[in-house]
Amino acid sequence: MATDLRISNISKIYPGCIANDNVSLQFKSGKIYALLGENGAGKSTLVKILSGVISPDNGEVFLNEKNLKLNSPLDAKKNKIGMVFQHFNLFETLSVFENLSIDATEDNKSLRVRINEIFKKYNFSIDLDVPVLNLSAGQKQKVEIIRCLLRSPKVLIMDEPTSVLTEQETEELFISLKKFCDEGILIIYITHKLKEVLSLCDEVAVMRKGKVVSVSQTQNEKVETLANKMVGQKLAK
């Protein structure tokens, strides 16, 4: 079944700051979507709303026309929305397997079987029994992704995912995200990096000062035009 995520008139106001100003967007599975903007554009607030960390002051979120009440991260998980934050939410002194088992519902043996199936399917390779603190940034991110995949997500949101990755780790991430997309997972990619948007994503929504100012197909965009939309003026060449 195709996945349709619709954000309708979302607003969030903090003292002295309109973080999200009547934001409406629609995403469908089969594509990778970018949410692009400078720091302070409103991306992080919208991500926190979609992941249930905070609630909007106004507006609604629909998944396949079901009105989601995202009052907590648990609500997002129940509705098959997976989230990989920029700063990894892992227990450094615990092993990879111990981290993955925290939210698991099956016994350890069954869980290891499922994890190994994911490893084989996506060509992941991580020692399950080493402490997380011994992993590279790219490996830690894979642990977060695996944790999401264990819940069979319909939506996977990646928040500034390449900020601490090497070039090789970034390439590996892109390959994985394209595979997830091909399998029907709706991917929302949060970033301020223009070249990544053009090389990975199918559509891009540009945010500025809490508003969505542009939605377009990336094949029709260039770095310069996206940069102009981000800052709200034509940049000098």
Model-derived features with residue positions:
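Glycine-rich phosphate-binding loops of nucleotide-dependent enzymes
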Residues: A2-K237
